[in-house]
C-alpha cells in the first residue's frame, strides 16, 4: 500500500501524460475528439483507469465510441511506455480505458431540472389566479373578555361572602 496522496499525484500525472500523447503524438484519426477526463490509480500503483469522453465532429453528430475505444486499445502499449518514461516509477501501471458517463448523467440531470422548472412555472401560473379556500383570514379572532370570564379569573379567597 502507498500513501493516498502519492496515488492521487501519480494519477494526475498519468492523466496529463496520456492526454498530451493523444493530442500531440498519436496520429490515429479515431482519437481526434477524445478527451481524458479523470484518472484513478489503485493503492498498489499497478493499475490505472483512464476515463475519457468522445465528442462528435460537430455539434449535431454523435460520437463514435466504439472507434475511439478501438483506437485507445491499439495505442495502449505506446501510451503505457510514455507513462513509464514520464513518471519514473519502478513499475509502470497497466492502463485501462473506460468511457466516462459523467457528461451523459449531467445532461440527464439538466433535463430533469428543466422539467421541474417547467412544472414549477405551471404551478405558479395556476396559483396566481387562485383564491384561498375558506375565509380570507383563517386565524381565529381573540376572544373578548366577558363579565362571566372576569368572575372565573378572580382568586377564590378574595370573594366576599354575602
UniProtKB/Swiss-Prot annotation:
Cellular compartment(s): Cytoplasm
GO CC field: cytosol
InterPro entries linked: KH_dom-like_a/b, RbfA, RbfA_dom_sf, Ribosome-bd_factorA_CS
Keywords of this entry: Cytoplasm, Ribosome biogenesis
A GO term, aspect molecular function: ribosomal small subunit binding
Bias-annotated ranges (Low complexity): 125-136
Record's keyword annotation contains Metal-binding: no
Chloroplast keyword on record: no
UniProt-annotated stretches for the region Disordered: 121-162
UniProt record similarity statement: Belongs to the RbfA family.
Function description: One of several proteins that assist in the late maturation steps of the functional core of the 30S ribosomal subunit. Associates with free 30S ribosomal subunits (but not with 30S subunits that are part of 70S ribosomes or polysomes). Required for efficient processing of 16S rRNA. May interact with the 5'-terminal helix region of 16S rRNA.
Subunit relationships: Monomer. Binds 30S ribosomal subunits, but not 50S ribosomal subunits or 70S ribosomes.
HAMAP family referenced in this protein's UniProt entry, alphabetically: RbfA
Protein name, entry field: Ribosome-binding factor A
Biological source species: Rhodococcus jostii (strain RHA1)
Taxonomy of the source species: Bacteria, Bacillati, Actinomycetota, Actinomycetes, Mycobacteriales
Gene designation: rbfA
Amino acid at each position: 500500500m502507498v500513501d493516498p496522496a502519492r496515488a492521487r499525484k501519480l494519477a494526475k500525472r498519468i492523466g496529463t501524460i496520456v492526454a498530451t500523447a493523444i493530442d500531440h503524438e498519436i496520429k490515429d484519426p479515431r482519437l481526434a475528439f477524445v478527451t481524458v477526463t479523470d484518472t484513478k490509480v489503485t493503492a498498489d500503483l499497478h493499475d490505472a483507469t483512464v476515463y475519457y469522453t468522445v465528442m462528435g465532429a460537430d455539434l449535431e453528430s454523435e460520437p463514435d465510441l466504439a472507434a475511439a475505444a478501438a483506437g485507445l486499445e491499439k495505442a495502449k502499449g505506446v501510451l503505457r511506455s510514455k507513462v513509464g518514461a514520464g513518471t519514473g516509477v519502478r513499475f509502470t501501471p497497466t492502463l485501462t480505458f473506460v468511457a466516462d458517463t459523467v457528461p451523459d448523467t449531467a445532461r440527464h440531470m439538466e433535463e430533469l431540472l428543466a422539467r421541474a422548472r417547467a412544472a414549477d412555472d405551471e404551478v405558479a401560473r395556476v396559483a396566481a389566479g387562485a383564491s384561498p379556500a375558506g375565509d380570507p383570514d383563517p386565524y381565529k379572532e381573540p376572544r373578548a373578555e366577558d363579565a362571566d370570564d372576569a368572575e372565573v379569573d378572580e382568586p377564590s379567597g378574595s370573594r366576599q361572602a354575602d
